A protein has these predicted regions:
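Core SAM-dependent methyltransferase catalytic element
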Residues: 227-229, 248-268
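Short alpha-helix
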Residues: 210-235
Length: 268
């Protein structure tokens, strides 16, 4: 996978997304907007982040959050083009399942896994909704740069908890909320957005539109707790070795503050 595509995912930081417009939280409208993005130019505009990368400058090889997944049943939320499912398949997971809001993304996943000699059960649905995924079934549920698209964080975490066996593990990554507030300007880091502002906004990028909300870190932590998870590990640090390969404003920013966060939680 192209490293540049990994890096593009984190471009959604303060001062780097163009002109954001505040919008009302209308679930159907947000789903339609974001589904259209991923059915058309999502990969071209935003890029793809997939295992072994959790985001820019963070990798599973360094973090070792999954451990041995051989014989394990795995579900990916927001499976994108299938690279993370392929990674788990190569590590001998016994069952691969993937969910995505975009049928176009799922078709890419089918084609990609077929070329890799793998298969997965794929479901097209928003992550917030009931979609026939079995309960108390999976050893791992994971999401690489997808959870932040949900319109109902606590509801999504409750659904994910229902899919997991007791003591099952949920791992996800997303843009760090501080990254969304700070921009690198003239060799300085400048706050451009209020950290506490969780309102929804739309951004136009290359004739396409996306709609998001930038949630506080505490919002994720509290939603996990309410859904019956206990957090085992949270990672904010970037990998120095990966950062050394780049010399631009984004990598300089990543040396000063977190751009990605990862949480590993266990179902009680």
């Amino acid at each position: 996978m192209d490293n540049n595509s990994v890096n593009r995912t984190n471009i959604m930081g303060a001062g780097e997304v163009g002109c954001a417009i505040s919008v009302d939280m209308d679930r159907d409208s947000i789903h339609n907007t974001n589904k259209t993005l991923w059915d058309t130019k999502g990969n071209e505009i935003i890029g793809t982040t997939a295992l072994p990368f959790y985001g820019s400058f963070v990798s599973e090889e360094k973090c070792q959050l999954f451990g041995d997944v051989s014989g394990k049943k795995m579900l990916e939320i927001g499976c994108g083009s299938g690279q993370s499912l392929q990674y788990q398949g190569e590590h001998k997971a016994s069952e691969l399942w993937g969910m995505d809001i975009s049928e176009n993304q799922l078709e890419k996943t089918r084609e990609y896994l077929t070329t890799c000699g793998l298969s997965a059960k794929l479901i097209c649905s928003p992550m917030e909704e009931e979609c026939g995924i079995p309960e108390d079934y999976f050893d791992f549920v994971y999401s690489i740069y997808a959870i932040g698209w949900t319109t109902d964080l606590e509801g999504t975490f409750c659904r994910i908890a229902s899919y997991l066996k007791k003591d099952g593990v949920f791992i996800f990554s997303w843009s760090h909320p501080i990254h969304k507030c700070v921009v690198a300007e003239n060799d300085m880091l400048v706050f451009k957005k209020c950290y506490f502002d969780e309102s929804w906004y739309s951004v136009s990028l290359d004739e396409s539109t996306l709609t998001l909300s930038d949630r506080k870190l505490s919002t994720y932590v509290n939603a996990l707790s309410k859904a019956g998870f206990v957090i085992e590990q949270m990672i904010e640090e970037s990998d120095d070795e990966i950062m050394q390969s780049r010399d631009d404003n984004f990598s300089k920013k990543a040396k000063m503050l977190p751009v990605t966060f990862i949480i590993k939680a266990r179902k009680l």
